[in-house]
Amino acid sequence: MAAKEVIFGDAARAKMVEGVNVLANAVKVTLGPKGRNVVLERSFGAPTVTKDGVSVAKEIELKDKLQNMGAQLVKEVASRTSDNAGDGTTTATVLAQAIVREGMKYVAAGMNPMDLKRGIDKAVAATVEQLALIAKPCTTTKEIAQVGAISANSDYSIGERIAEAMEKVGKEGVITVEDGKSLNDELDIVEGMQFDRGYLSPYFINNPEKQTAILENPFILLCDKKISNIRDLLPVLEQVAKAGRPLLIIAEDIEGEALATLVVNNIRGILKTCAVKAPGFGDRRKAMLEDIAILSGGQVVAEEVGLTLEKITLEELGQAKRIEIGKENTTLIDGNGQAINIEARVKQIRAQIEEATSDYDREKLQERVAKLAGGVAVIKVGAATEVEMKEKKARVEDALHATRAAVEEGIVPGGGVALLRARANINVKGDNSDQEAGIRIVLRAMEEPLRMIVQNAGEEASVVVAKVLEGKGNFGYNAANGIYGDMVEMGVLDPAKVTRSALQNAASIAALLLTTDCMVAEVAEEKPAGGDMGGMGGMGGMGGMM
């Protein structure tokens, strides 16, 4: 086991604070509408340019192990805030640095770190209560656009795209971000339910221009087994042919003579059909087939429920107004399912989301809810170069998280004003003078986001903070244009969840740093420089070769 270095007291804390400052100073240059970019080196390809706090934080590793511990703890603040609220990572880092900086003065003066921590916790709890009172619901498309724009570093076109997407697919809908093919941002709305499986044979195509198969008013046969024998399918094919309507078959797989017969019937115009593999794998495939069945008003042909292909009637088949099948996607529009059944299914999936342990499972379940309840919107990000594309895409994703957070917990005035207004209404007392000091640490740190925004805009922070404190309510300073006024009216809004998460996470990690009194790190081994190779002995004469 490698030797360890153990450092105590002020020396340990001083090293940690150095690490905190290196990371926080790199992150905080990005704060506010006039924040600067940070360029991140890549081992191959072009460097990445970003204004996203957590992206900068994740890149930083310091050579000094003790400093690095401090930096990694603040990195945790940014990461946790990003996970909880999707934005506010820079604000959280700035708050953490301010709490650590103020707190270290009191620790050095001999105050009890544990009492300081209790005071910090009391102040944070009181502030969170006040933020909830200040917050107002975010309901209008305009407010959603403003929140998105502020989060995307004052890019109003991004805010408008996100608001438009939310309006189209609803608050439950899935909004995904993809690389675009042009210079402009585009928004694609997929109505109805879409899943990522296409036609099994190009012979099903009936729209050569779009290379898709379009079925109007079709029946839908859902089966959780492979279909290879045409005899199994004949009874249902005859019933559908009599009804004179097209048929979409979704099964685990369709192969051999079954697929060949369907293709031949389709080409000859006897029965308009299309065959598609069921989406997903394993248990998720069964669940998604069930979703499609509920949406289309049909039943899944499965042995567990006593249904076989030979026994099935038209009543068990699903129906839809229109289905479009492409090479890779199938879209089911206006299914025949009953609203009450769809709502019950959505409720059931939501209960599963509550119990889901992994992020991947949760994401997949949310996708299923969206496909049943809302729809799917795709924002295609346009840019001139790949570097710009990556930077812009990261901002769009941030803005998307921020708007979701705003819809969830409401909005507060932005630009660091919400924390100052919450601070003005806090009436909390500590049990002793050390706890009182802990409360003062947090109250002082709450000015820091506004100070940093103003500093990055090239103005005098103390003057602006004093003027904002003179005002009331939503009165604040808009750093984008240097105007004082009502932040909500000017469209400078923050999601309450983002501000709350930033403060809670910053205080949590900062309090841990303040209560640290010992650090243990591996001793860096000094590797001796490699000496030159000794002269190699001469090779003996080689015997004569035969």
Curated annotation (Swiss-Prot):
Predominant location: cytoplasm
Which SUPFAM superfamilies does the UniProt entry name for this protein?
GroEL apical domain-like, GroEL equatorial domain-like, GroEL-intermediate domain like
Q: Which InterPro entries match?
A: Chaperonin_Cpn60_CS, Cpn60/GroEL, Cpn60/GroEL/TCP-1, GroEL-like_apical_dom_sf, GROEL-like_equatorial_sf, TCP-1-like_intermed_sf
GO MF annotation list: ATP binding; ATP-dependent protein folding chaperone; isomerase activity; unfolded protein binding
Binding annotation for ATP? 30-33, 51, 87-91, 415, 478-480, 494
Q: What EC number(s) has UniProt assigned to this enzyme?
A: 5.6.1.7
GO cellular component terms, semicolon-separated: cytoplasm
Q: Which reaction does it catalyse?
A: ATP + H2O + a folded polypeptide = ADP + phosphate + an unfolded polypeptide
Q: Which GO terms describe its biological process?
A: protein refolding
Q: What does this protein do?
A: Together with its co-chaperonin GroES, plays an essential role in assisting protein folding. The GroEL-GroES system forms a nano-cage that allows encapsulation of the non-native substrate proteins and provides a physical environment optimized to promote and accelerate protein folding.
Give the family this protein belongs to, as stated in its UniProt record: Belongs to the chaperonin (HSP60) family.
Could you identify this protein by its name? Answer: Chaperonin GroEL
Q: Please give the organism.
A: Herminiimonas arsenicoxydans
